[in-house]
Amino acid sequence: MASLGGDNSQAEGAEVRHVPVLIAEVIDALKPAPGAVIVDGTFGAGGYTRRILETGADVIAIDRDPTAIEAGRAMEKEFPGRLNLVESRFSALDEAVARMSGAGKKVDGVVLDIGVSSMQIDEAERGFSFQKDGPLDMRMSSGGPSAADAVNRLKTGDLARIFNFLGEERHAGRIARMIEKRRAAKPFTRTLDLANAIETLVGRNPKDRIHPATRVFQALRVYVNDELGELARALLAAERILKPGGRLVVVTFHSLEDRMVKRFFADRAGGSAGSRHMPETHMRLPSFTPAVKGAVGPTPEEEERNPRARSAKLRAGIRTENPPLEDDLSLFGLPKLPETNELARS
């Protein structure tokens, strides 16, 4: 996706539209070459895909948002036979590759840009923005429960945990209790209704760079779209479909996602199984080696040009010849939150 970036992404840089973040660093880490096959798991406005295609590589581009896929049809015509658009969750990118290229097909690279796209924020009717009035939706696709469903149906304690863990909101409990009280009189259905209620409760320091509702909106979006679960499953899927020497490049904008990616690459570096509490059981061969040292951030010039890039971090790994390690979602430390499918039935 052409991601917005950090927590204050709606407050700053509003004039910057659909600018791919860390594009030079992404291309340098990905190293696409003519004839290579690259998966862009988060197509969005197509910024990464276009630059990859310009190197001569072919792209399988995935997005769960049908609006993004439809907008990308023009690019598909611009690069005939070299761009395949797939409407799908990026957690199923291995299935998308099999559908496009055949079962067992491996690829040369995978790039993931984690977060909401600027196209989605800019369209008030999608309900992602706390600065524009629209339905309280936030779904990246049309299926499943909306943010309004979560706000109006979840228990107060569950809302507080979502705001705390997924949004790192320090007023999580107060906001959840306010929502419980207000929704009893009138359900929340509009973005500005919720944003204004939060601002009234928490207050706003003129020196604050972010709106008081920023972290709550982030948490609801991440919850409704299962963004952390999607990322975890996408990393494991990328491990399965990359050729030896293939590269996985991930750009994140929040500490939650960055910690998950960091933990994944550290785990996939192999080594002994076990911990200080348990004896070592066996040696695990690495499935990835580092492609860059640590996390790469934007240059001062990019931050000035595009404030949305300020919180971006890039991590990348190179696939080894060793088989994939076990699919273990527990390594990501995801919290136990109410299932959205249960919410849809409530």
Swiss-Prot record:
GO biological process terms on file: rRNA base methylation
Region Disordered: start-end pairs: 270-346
Binding-site list for S-adenosyl-L-methionine: 46-48, 63, 90, 113, 120
EC number of the protein: 2.1.1.199
GO molecular function: rRNA (cytosine-N4-)-methyltransferase activity
A UniProt-annotated Pfam family: Methyltransf_5
Domain of life where this protein originates: Bacteria
Catalytic activity entry: cytidine(1402) in 16S rRNA + S-adenosyl-L-methionine = N(4)-methylcytidine(1402) in 16S rRNA + S-adenosyl-L-homocysteine + H(+)
Family matches, as Gene3D superfamilies: Putative methyltransferase TM0872, insert domain, Vaccinia Virus protein VP39
Compartmental location: Cytoplasm
Keyword vocabulary terms for this entry: Cytoplasm, Methyltransferase, rRNA processing, S-adenosyl-L-methionine, Transferase
GO CC annotation, single: cytoplasm
Function (record text): Specifically methylates the N4 position of cytidine in position 1402 (C1402) of 16S rRNA.
Family affiliation: Belongs to the methyltransferase superfamily. RsmH family.
Protein name per Swiss-Prot or TrEMBL: Ribosomal RNA small subunit methyltransferase H
Native organism: Brucella suis (strain ATCC 23445 / NCTC 10510)
Lineage summary: Bacteria, Pseudomonadati, Pseudomonadota, Alphaproteobacteria, Hyphomicrobiales
Gene expressing this chain: rsmH
